[in-house]
């Protein structure tokens, strides 16, 4: 099992023990850290986060965990389903969203998946933002919402 945590996202082989592979608990942890960062830094008035994914066999499970976590953190989720990285990036700006998550491990083998994190401009997080997501996740310093978000398709 492999879990790689970097400023460009969280990627790994699906399954395994916490911290050793990309399993549902790790997905919740890093999605919650990302949601906390977005809540602190966005200048967009929207409460939406776009989620798109590739066709990997684990994609449906990862999408469900990510979307449920984002809603639990108080964000409205725009699930665009199967979508390329550029399509998801563009959807962030077209939806007026405060961020986006692309579920794809790109060139990695099929047993891998990843969370690629976008800002309100549909761009990958910069080094400082990526490091802050990792810091929040490590400290479990999440900021929870008073109200649950909704899902949009």
Language model: regions and residue ranges:
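An N-terminal, well-structured beta->alpha segment
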Residues: 1-68, 72-73, 150
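Gly/Ser/Thr-enriched, mixed-charge loops and adjacent short helices
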Residues: 13, 113-152
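Pocket-edge positions in alpha/beta enzyme catalytic cores
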Residues: 19-22, 80, 122-125
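Generic alpha-helical secondary structure signal
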Residues: 25, 86, 127-131
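Alpha-helical scaffold segments in soluble metabolic enzymes
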Residues: 29, 33-36, 87-90, 132, ...
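Short, surface-exposed, polar/charged, turn-prone segments marking secondary-structure boundaries
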Residues: 32-34, 77-79, 106, 127-133, ...
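Ferredoxin-reductase
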Residues: 43-121
């Amino acid at each position: 099992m492999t879990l790689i945590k970097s400023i460009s996202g969280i990627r790994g082989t699906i399954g395994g023990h916490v911290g050793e592979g990309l399993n549902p608990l790790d997905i919740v942890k890093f999605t919650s850290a990302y949601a906390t960062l977005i809540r602190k830094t966005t200048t967009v008035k929207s409460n939406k986060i776009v989620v798109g994914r590739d066709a990997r066999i684990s994609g449906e499970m990862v999408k469900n965990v990510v979307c449920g976590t984002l809603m639990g953190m108080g964000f409205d989720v725009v699930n665009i389903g199967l979508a390329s990285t550029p399509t998801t990036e563009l959807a962030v700006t077209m939806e007026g969203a405060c961020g986006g998550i692309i579920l794809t491990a790109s060139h990695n083998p099929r047993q891998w998946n990843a969370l690629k994190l976008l800002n309100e401009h549909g761009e990958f997080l910069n080094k400082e933002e990526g490091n802050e997501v990792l810091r929040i996740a490590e400290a479990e310093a999440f900021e929870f919402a008073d109200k649950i978000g909704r899902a949009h398709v």
